[in-house]
Amino acid sequence: KDIPRCELVKILRRHGFEGFVGKTVANWVCLVKHESGYRTTAFNNNGPNSRDYGIFQINSKYWCNDGKTRGSKNACNINCSKLRDDNIADDIQCAKKIAREARGLTPWVAWKKYCQGKDLSSYVRGC
């Protein structure tokens, strides 16, 4: 399903994302918009080596197990298919782990390209 922007803002605030790894909720909303278009079912194939799953586009090489990524680290200890359902609680735990280990949002290419260093106030405006 699509998670409406302001609902996502509420969910992220409730889960302590404001100020987490020094980033605002607006940064995360921008990341989600450009990674998955707010879709919980988002899927992206990166060729033979890995795939990205769910609203945060979590990668199968390092973070989740999809049964077809050779040498997957599965650092979030989760089946990738669980990252494409409507329950995003587990996605949130994994995304926080990724951000914590990176001390920021640099693992997400879309964040670096579209969000880093930009005015992101519009992502939370009116919520």
Swiss-Prot record:
Its EC number is 3.2.1.17. It is found in: Secreted. One of its GO terms (molecular function) is metal ion binding. Residues 1-127 form the C-type lysozyme domain. The keyword Secreted applies. It holds the Pfam family Lys. It is an enzyme of class 3 (hydrolase). Keywords: Antimicrobial, Bacteriolytic enzyme, Calcium, Disulfide bond, Glycosidase, Hydrolase, Metal-binding, Secreted. Lysozymes have primarily a bacteriolytic function; those in tissues and body fluids are associated with the monocyte-macrophage system and enhance the activity of immunoagents. This is Lysozyme C. It comes from Columba livia (Rock dove). The gene is LYZ.
